[in-house]
UniProtKB/Swiss-Prot annotation:
The gene is nag096. One of its GO terms (biological process) is glycosaminoglycan metabolic process. GO terms for molecular function: beta-N-acetylhexosaminidase activity; polysaccharide binding. Its EC number is 3.2.1.52. It is an enzyme of class 3 (hydrolase). The active site is at E531. Keywords: Disulfide bond, Glycosidase, Hydrolase, Signal. It catalyses: Hydrolysis of terminal non-reducing N-acetyl-D-hexosamine residues in N-acetyl-beta-D-hexosaminides. Residues 1-19 form the signal peptide. It comes from Pseudoalteromonas piscicida. This is Beta-hexosaminidase B. GO terms for cellular component: membrane. Disulfide bonds join C46-C53, C389-C397, C496-C542.
Length: 773
């Protein structure tokens, strides 16, 4: 699926021409020219009866020959889907673990020269964008591990002077449909300049008075505009200054200062029976008044005031706004585990979330490729687990998955200290945002497992076997062989050993301490629990457990139920991904469960969200085909992103989403092959009166190697997410149980389509208005 960064190590082989020294290692790093070519994404036949594959070539050359760099090497590189068939006799390719592969010289290899030496190979699944090809190689020799690995210069990521975006110059151009479409049945269009010109929608509206997200009700009181250049004077009743300080700071940043001589803004909070924030904002000729039912309502009213502001002349329209959100849960998931995001990025994201009235930050802090939160007493989680570099022993860092290279100071590495995390919590609270931490388990736990194994080895060497064993996450007698969905053979906690739960209890207790220190209660914890393979078949502990537990169903369900009870005892709500929660027995779970519905709408998985909502759980919609912001904006090889759930997620697609009526999208969208599909709701209907709890966008980070790349993928889609999470549009097709939808079913009428298009034009006009924020 992705060809990632290369890391070449000069490696001892059985009969090397020359034994490499550091000079030769350095030379190869500087002079080896590597080119990657995607030959075909849809071969007529795949070797070894593989259902789906793609065909690629690597070529190696040097400008001048160096016989000392001819044979004593291996090339390590990241490719997320396994290479399974290699042609020719120049090189052999071996899958190591996860996405790490190794190239070694084979019998036909006679040395590098100015003429390219090539290897062609087949990889499982598919690859369609240049961002799925990563950079970087390193050099070392196994028989002398004291040599320093060197990144091969030709594979370094470069900055494009025209676009300012990162690019890999070692990739040959992607120019044909055979490099974009994944099979003979794939009709995905090439969304280049010609396509975009033909499908452009010219703006038909000037920037009207309005807000993102759209308020429930907005009435223009006058064509006059109120001048705030002299500042504002907030008069508060029933609310503390701290509760609105960050909204006030945003206004100040935009040029509206807080001063006693400024225009009076009366802010009154009077609680009522309604728990959701509800506010009225009135901008009159001589004053501004805000009435809300809680502090969040007043905060959002001031954010609306900032959104109405013309930043050129500091004037605002005279309006009356009555507003309340569609969903109580309006979230953004940020993955900082695969590739790290700086604290500054998180704080800035919190500011933007608050500006557009999002209120939940799901922080994905641990996965196979990194552990990003310091835990008191378990230093190895971050000293080892927060870094990827080249260390085959994994005692000082994890393997360089996702093409991480060998630099521990690279942007992809790092963690939040206790003080960093406390600062994030407090900053989020000040912006009326709740942080939901997640340390994914029992799958996606390789960083934790390897870090605790490094801890075990260190303490054993110090003669402390009891301490060493306490948090060890490996059962040495377990001989189960498996491959996870990301092709790891060692990334899943053994759910049958006591140490696993000792470790989890320790981690959860320490996370709760951090929340307590911040003055921000840990209300909800997301356990992850997704994509866990059928494992532990040869585990003695699991065989014993299975025999001893009455009504045993499955190991993943057992794990989730046990951790859920642990969280419930600590007074913490349980959240998890729907695929893992599908393994539990509802009767064995706490009553208050949050399920992130991962149902891919067009793959007939909407029933998952319906099923969990029907059993009384709080379902937060997380449909990958519309809410995953690590996917491309358009189906074009230059667009960054993954492609398994959707070939293109434009801001407009997020805007068009009708979250209360999942099957209805069969009328307006197509599947990943650009084909129409049918959604039959008759067997999986929502019960009458059942509603979803919220909507969440997702910024996964496998392909986002820098904060700049993350920003590119997040904006402006974040604003479209906020629009749908806050505002229920008039054009959305109401849900009706049991309907069957298709491109020809006709429920989404021409009138509704016209209303949607007019609403989109309003949204675009506001978004593109340089005079507002």
């Amino acid at each position: 699926m992705k060809f990632n960064r290369l890391m070449a190590l000069l490696f001892g082989v059985s009969s090397p021409l020359y034994a490499l020294d550091q000079t030769a290692v350095n030379w190869l790093g500087q002079n080896l020219d590597v080119k990657y070519t995607l030959l075909d994404t849809k071969p007529t036949t795949c070797p070894k009866a593989q259902q789906k594959c793609y065909y690629s070539e690597l070529s190696f050359s040097v400008r001048k020959e160096n016989t000392k760099a001819n044979n004593d090497f291996a090339i390590f590189f990241s490719q997320l889907m396994p290479i399974y068939h290699v042609e020719g006799d120049n090189f052999a390719i071996t899958h190591i673990n996860g996405d790490i592969h190794k190239i070694t010289p084979a019998a036909g290899f006679s040395g590098f020269s100015s003429a390219p030496t090539t290897v062609r190979f087949y990889t499982k699944d598919s690859q369609v964008t240049r961002s799925e090809v990563y950079a970087k190689l390193c050099c070392e020799r196994t028989r002398s591990l004291k040599l320093t690995p060197q990144v091969i210069k030709s594979t370094q990521t470069q900055r494009d002077n025209d676009t300012g975006l990162d690019c890999n110059l070692n990739l040959t151009p992607f120019v044909t449909l055979n490099q974009l479409q994944t099979s003979s049945k794939d009709d995905t269009p090439w969304m280049g300049s010609e396509y975009l010109y033909q499908h452009q929608v010219k703006p038909t509206l000037d920037a009207a008075i309005g807000l993102i997200p759209k308020p429930k009700q907005l009435t223009v009181l006058s064509d006059k505009r109120l001048n705030l250049a002299a500042g504002i004077n907030l008069q508060l009743s029933g609310i503390s200054a701290d509760a609105i300080a960050m909204a006030q700071q945003r206004l100040n940043t935009l040029g509206v200062k807080s001063t006693k001589e400024g225009l009076v803004v009366n802010v009154a909070v009077k609680p009522n029976k309604q728990s959701s924030p509800h506010y009225q904002l009135t901008v009159a000729e001589n004053n501004i008044s805000i009435q809300g039912n809680n502090s969040a309502a007043a905060f959002y009213a001031l954010q609306s005031l900032a959104g109405l502001l013309d930043i050129n002349d500091l004037r605002i329209p005279m309006v009356d706004i009555i507003d309340t959100p569609r969903y109580d849960f309006r979230g953004l998931h940020v993955d900082v585990a695969r590739n790290f995001r700086s604290k500054a990025f998180i704080l800035q994201t919190i500011e933007q979330m608050a500006a557009y009235k999002l209120n939940k930050l799901h922080l994905h802090l641990a996965d196979d490729e990194g552990w990003r939160l310091a835990i008191d007493g378990l230093d190895e989680l971050t000293s080892v687990g927060a870094y990827r570099c080249f260390d085959l022993t994994e005692t000082r860092c994890l393997l360089p998955q996702l093409g991480a290279g060998n630099d521990k100071n690279a942007q992809v590495n790092g963690f939040y200290s206790a003080e960093d995390y406390i600062e994030i919590l407090r900053y989020a609270k000040a912006h009326h945002i709740e942080v939901l931490p997640s340390l994914d388990m029992p799958g996606h736990s390789r960083a934790a497992i390897i870090a605790m194994e490094a801890r075990y080895k260190k303490l054993m060497a110090q003669g402390k076997p009891e301490d060493a064993q306490k948090y060890r996450l490996v059962e040495t007698a377990d001989k189960t062989r498996y491959s996870s969905i990301q092709h790891y053979n060692d990334n899943t906690l053994n759910v049958c050993i006591a140490n696993t739960y000792t470790f989890i209890d320790k981690v959860l207790s320490e996370v709760k301490v951090l929340h307590d220190r911040a003055g921000v209660p840990l209300n909800t914890y997301h356990i992850g629990a997704d994509e866990t393979a059928v494992l532990w078949l040869e585990s003695p502990a699991c065989k014993k457990l299975q025999a001893s537990v009455k009504d045993f169903t499955n190991f993943n369900g057992y794990f989730i139920e046990r951790v859920a009870k642990l969280l419930d005892k600590k007074g913490i709500q349980v959240a998890g991904w729907s695929d893992g929660l599908g393994d539990v027995r509802a009767a064995n779970m706490p009553a208050n469960i949050q399920s992130n519905g991962l149902g891919d709408i067009k793959r007939k998985r909407a029933p998952v969200a319906h099923r969990f909502a029907n059993q009384g759980w709080q379902v937060v919609l997380s449909s990958p085909d519309v809410t995953y912001f690590d996917f491309p904006y358009q189906s074009h090889p230059e667009e960054r992103g993954n492609h398994w759930a959707s070939r293109a997620i434009e801001s407009k697609k997020m805007f068009e989403f009708m979250p209360d009526n999942l099957p209805a999208h069969a009328e307006i969208w197509k599947n990943t092959n650009n084909h129409a599909y049918i959604a039959n709701d008759s067997d999986s209907s929502l019960n009458k009166g059942v509603q979803f709890a919220g909507l969440q966008g997702h910024l996964w980070s496998e392909m986002l190697r820098s904060d700049a790349q993350a920003e590119y993928m997040l904006y402006p889609r974040l604003l479209a997410l906020a629009e749908r999470a806050w505002h229920h549009a008039e054009w959305e097709l109401p849900y009706q149980a049991g309907r069957i939808y298709s491109q020809s079913s006709g429920y989404f009428t021409a009138k509704l389509q016209a209303q949607r298009e007019a609403d989109w034009q309003r949204f675009v006009a506001i978004l593109g208005n340089s005079r507002t924020t």
